[in-house]
Regions:
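Sec/Tat signal peptide C-region and signal peptidase I cleavage site
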Residues: 24-30
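Compact alpha-helical subdomains of small soluble proteins
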Residues: 65-136
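N-terminal secretory signal peptides that target proteins for export/translocation
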Residues: 1-8
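Bacterial N-terminal signal peptides
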Residues: 12-24
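Alpha-helical transmembrane segments
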Residues: 9-14, 44-47
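N-terminal secretory signal peptides
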Residues: 30-75, 129-136
Length: 136
């Protein structure tokens, strides 16, 4: 059974996914060279990295999550990104989070469990901050 903290994190993740419909990405014309980033862009980039880290750490420590963190990332991308370049940046951050831990850990250790707990906590803070500041 899922603990309350993890359930709260999943709920907040769903709220962030819904932000994609509240704050759609602006369509750029041919003359524009860059897409205006939403004010919470860096927080979402960090969240992507956290998703990648958790996608590696949770199964390593025999934690089964349904849907997987990769599936959550795909849902997030579908909800948040219309621009292909922006989508690629989120994917790269996810992959950085995954690779960073895959090089360091081959088995679940106390340090891996601590990192996992800290990432869950940081993800909760990011989601709470983004939804409270921009979800209105």
């Amino acid at each position: 059974m899922m603990n309350r903290r993890l359930q709260a994190f999943f709920f907040r993740t769903a709220v962030v996914l819904a932000l994609g419909s509240v704050y759609p990405v602006q369509v750029v014309s041919a003359q524009e060279t860059a897409v205006d980033e939403p004010p919470y862009e860096q927080q979402l980039m960090r969240l992507s990295e956290i998703f990648g880290a958790l996608h590696f750490l949770r199964p390593l420590c025999k934690e089964s999550d349904t849907p997987s963190w990769r599936d959550r990332m795909e849902d997030f991308l579908d909800a948040e990104t219309l621009d292909e370049n922006r989508r690629r940046r989120f994917i790269e951050r996810f992959n950085q989070g995954y690779r960073g831990f895959s090089v360091a850990y081959r088995e679940c250790t106390e340090a891996a469990r601590l990192a996992m707990a800290q990432y869950l906590s940081e993800g909760e803070v990011i989601i709470s901050d983004v939804t409270s500041r921009y979800g209105r």
